[in-house]
Each structure stands twice: as C-alpha cells, then as structure tokens.
Amino acid sequence: MKVYSFRKEQLLFALYALIIAGALFAGLRAEYVETFAMPVSRKVVVLDPGHGGWDPGMVGKGDILEKNINLEIALKLQSLLEQGGATVLMTRIEDEALGTGKRSDMRARSTLAGASHADVIISIHQNSYPSEKVMGTQVFFYEGSERSRRLAELIQTEVKHFLGQMTNREAKSDSSYYILKQTSIPAVIVECGFLSSSTEARLLVDGEYQERMAWAIYKGIIEYFNTSGN
C-alpha cells in the first residue's frame, strides 16, 4: 500500500512539473512569436499619401492621377504594418485634401505628423520628368537628419531588391520638401515611380505591383528598426 502511495505522489509531482514547464514554454513561445511574427510591434508609423481632393498631384499618361496611386499604396502598406504589430496613423484615408490651399495642406500634414510622436514618417508620392525614358523609385530624406538618411537608404535597397529595378538610383537628400524639414522624427518621401513614363505608369496602377511596392517599403522599415536599436 505504501509503494502505491509513493508512486502516486511521484506521478502527481511529475504532472505538476509538466504543467509548470508547459506554461513557461507557452510564455517563451508567445514572446518568440511576437518577436518574429510582429517585427514592428509597438512602433508608431505615420503614412502620408500625398495630395488628394482638389489636388491631383502629377497627371500621368492616360490621365492617371497621382493622388489615387499614393492612397492605394499607402493603404496596402498600412495593412502590412498593422499585421506586423505597428500603430499606423494616416494623414488621409480617402480622396480628400487637408487644407484649402497647397500651403495649408502641407502645414496640416506636418502638424499631424509632428504631434503623433511617431517613430517614423513615410510620405508616398509619384514622380514626373520631361523624358519618358526616365523611370525608377527614389527615396528622399532631409539632408540634416542621419536617421532619415538610414531609413531612406534601407527602403531604397529593398525596392531595388524586391522589384528588381534596373536603375542606379540611390536615396537622395533634399531640403525643399516641406514635410521633411518640419519634423525631428525620421521621415522620408518615397517617389514610387514616374507617371511620365507610360511603361511605369501602367505598373503603378496595377494592384499586384502596388502590393510589391508596399512590401518593399515595409521591408525597409523593418530593417531600419532592426538596426537602429530603437
């Protein structure tokens, strides 16, 4: 009888130990999943789809409007970021401007972004040039911000890698963009492509290409957070 009682106690102890170990493993596993499946967890990102409403931005071949492409790419990027655990603040989620004129619109975007205390600001735009042969994505940053430079370079690298763009474009400093110089938060403008190129314009209105562009930008943001120590 004593032998049976001793074995029963051993079994109960072993079962208890397994339960504790399982709970600890579950906690570690949850932390592991959050770390790797949610790479931008607890980060705050401002997405600024350029133009909107009365301001169409660039008008490309076939009357393609920049404002619509900007919003489509930004919404796709928003989805990726939120799935990755980030809090995303959009300057607009529909076809609207933030002011009655260009200056008031830009001021409103900068004020919103600055008040957000975000980790990064990503402004989405499209480019244009007199020659139809000019193509490719280019990421701009404010020349006085080292963190913005790093963010821009990482996004530029991911765009080249993921979209296979055969250009020699590199991230470039620029002091003329209003939203870049009005904030201390790391900020970049992604000029996704040239609407003046009929070839690139066709790509930029394609939903699948927009998804790939959003993914490349997302990957660049992840790389920035992974290497910034934030």
Regions found by a protein language model. Give the residues of each.
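Catalytic-site microenvironment of enzymes
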Residues: 1-230
